[in-house]
Amino acid sequence: MILPINIYSDDILRLKAKPLKGVDSAIEELIASMFESMRNASGIGLAAPQVGRSIRLLVLDVSCVSKCEHEKPMVVINPHILSVRGHNDMEEGCLSVPGVQGYVVRPAAITLKYRDEHFAERTGEFSGMVARVIQHEIDHLDGTLFVDRMEKRDRKKIQKELTALASGIVDTEYPVVEREVVPIAKPT
């Protein structure tokens, strides 16, 4: 089932998500819906808060990205970054901030402890695009958006777009969470 995406300024995107205690049929269904929703929106990563669930769950599939065709889709539950190495600056975008891109400096490689779709504990080394997407999605679990990590001068360049999104002006090819936009009253 394709789920609507929460958009910039939706409160759930600023909450710290709660850990999962296990995987049941409802979580399995959510995981399948998250993959379907992510692919429908031409995304490469999606965190549960982006689809209205404040839990520490994310999915990613970077196999559509050049030089990443060999990468397998991943389910990451309750992630914890154990260590980081190096840094790189790369342009990012986000399904929750449609139409906005910006450069973000992130560690180039990470060691990650997490649980998989069967709730089995895993530790893995990730680099390149996979490491970047995991970090971007973990930020969602912590209530942080990529625009928060942009340099101040770069963020000023996108302020107009962020203001439009916050006021409900959203243009996407995928479903988004409907919200009531209350116009600001003008003084009489």
From Swiss-Prot:
<dbReference type="GO" id="GO:0043686">
    <property type="term" value="P:co-translational protein modification"/>
</dbReference>
<keyword id="KW-0378">Hydrolase</keyword>
<feature type="binding site">
    <location>
        <position position="140"/>
    </location>
    <ligand>
        <name>Fe cation</name>
    </ligand>
</feature>
<dbReference type="Pfam" id="PF01327">
    <property type="entry name" value="Pep_deformylase"/>
</dbReference>
<comment type="similarity">
    <text>Belongs to the polypeptide deformylase family.</text>
</comment>
<keyword id="KW-0408">Iron</keyword>
<dbReference type="GO" id="GO:0042586">
    <property type="term" value="F:peptide deformylase activity"/>
</dbReference>
<feature type="binding site">
    <location>
        <position position="94"/>
    </location>
    <ligand>
        <name>Fe cation</name>
    </ligand>
</feature>
<keyword id="KW-0479">Metal-binding</keyword>
<dbReference type="InterPro" id="IPR023635">
    <property type="entry name" value="Peptide_deformylase"/>
</dbReference>
<keyword id="KW-0648">Protein biosynthesis</keyword>
<dbReference type="InterPro" id="IPR036821">
    <property type="entry name" value="Peptide_deformylase_sf"/>
</dbReference>
<feature type="binding site">
    <location>
        <position position="136"/>
    </location>
    <ligand>
        <name>Fe cation</name>
    </ligand>
</feature>
<dbReference type="GO" id="GO:0046872">
    <property type="term" value="F:metal ion binding"/>
</dbReference>
<feature type="active site">
    <location>
        <position position="137"/>
    </location>
</feature>
<protein>
    <recommendedName>
        <fullName>Peptide deformylase</fullName>
        <ecNumber>3.5.1.88</ecNumber>
    </recommendedName>
</protein>
<comment type="function">
    <text>Removes the formyl group from the N-terminal Met of newly synthesized proteins. Requires at least a dipeptide for an efficient rate of reaction. N-terminal L-methionine is a prerequisite for activity but the enzyme has broad specificity at other positions.</text>
</comment>
<dbReference type="GO" id="GO:0006412">
    <property type="term" value="P:translation"/>
</dbReference>
